[in-house]
């Protein structure tokens, strides 16, 4: 009996790993992915964002946008199950594309809530005619975002900051000229 207990004691970590090793294994398994949370009614604004990200090397492996073919939900998949697995299996960086349409969509508000609960990092992009004062819900209205109808210099500055965040998060090098003129 004593020798059996010694064997169990010696190997207990194999069967009951401590919480820190469980957390680190889960974190290692999660790969970064950009999730563009938007209303499908705003697709004309979302398409150029996806094109810009694709031009710098983002693929459907690390970019999700439900309204854009090749970046959305595959055929025969349950929408909510697919979205749930995206949130649980990836380290998402969320780009909220905010508008009145966004706040009128229960699906968008669900995405916002999921990102808030999971404490995902995010950037807010406000569409033309949507103001910071209109930001509501789980998105922090005091967190600096960008407005597509800001003056060109400010918008370029904010886009450059977004490029730097994405470059760091995804380990890619994107020359400024390629980013600004994509």
Predicted regions and their residues:
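Conserved beta-strand scaffold positions in the cores of enzyme catalytic domains, especially
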Residues: 63, 122-124, 145-147
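C-terminal interaction surface of TIR/SEFIR-family domains
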Residues: 1-28, 44-47, 51, 55, ...
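Structural motif
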Residues: 38-40, 98-100, 149-150
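Residue-level detector of short, conserved catalytic/binding motifs and their immediate flanks
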Residues: 32-34, 113, 123, 143
């Amino acid at each position: 009996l004593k020798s059996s207990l010694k064997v169990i004691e010696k190997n207990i970590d194999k069967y009951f790993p401590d919480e820190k090793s469980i957390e680190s294994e889960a974190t290692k398994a999660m790969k970064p992915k950009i999730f563009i949370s938007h209303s499908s009614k705003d697709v004309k604004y979302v398409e150029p964002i996806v094109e810009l990200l694709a031009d710098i090397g983002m693929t459907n492996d690390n970019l999700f946008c439900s309204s854009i073919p090749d970046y959305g939900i595959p055929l025969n998949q349950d929408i909510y199950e697919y979205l749930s697995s995206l949130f649980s299996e990836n380290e998402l960086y969320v780009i909220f594309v905010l508008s009145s349409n966004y706040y009128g969509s229960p699906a968008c508000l669900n995405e916002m809530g999921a990102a808030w609960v999971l404490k995902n990092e995010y950037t807010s992009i406000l569409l033309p005619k949507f103001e910071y004062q209109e930001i509501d819900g789980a998105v922090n209205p005091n967190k600096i975002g960008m407005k597509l109808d800001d003056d060109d210099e400010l918008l370029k500055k904010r886009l450059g900051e977004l490029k730097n965040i994405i470059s760091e998060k995804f380990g890619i090098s994107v020359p400024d000229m390629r980013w600004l003129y994509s």
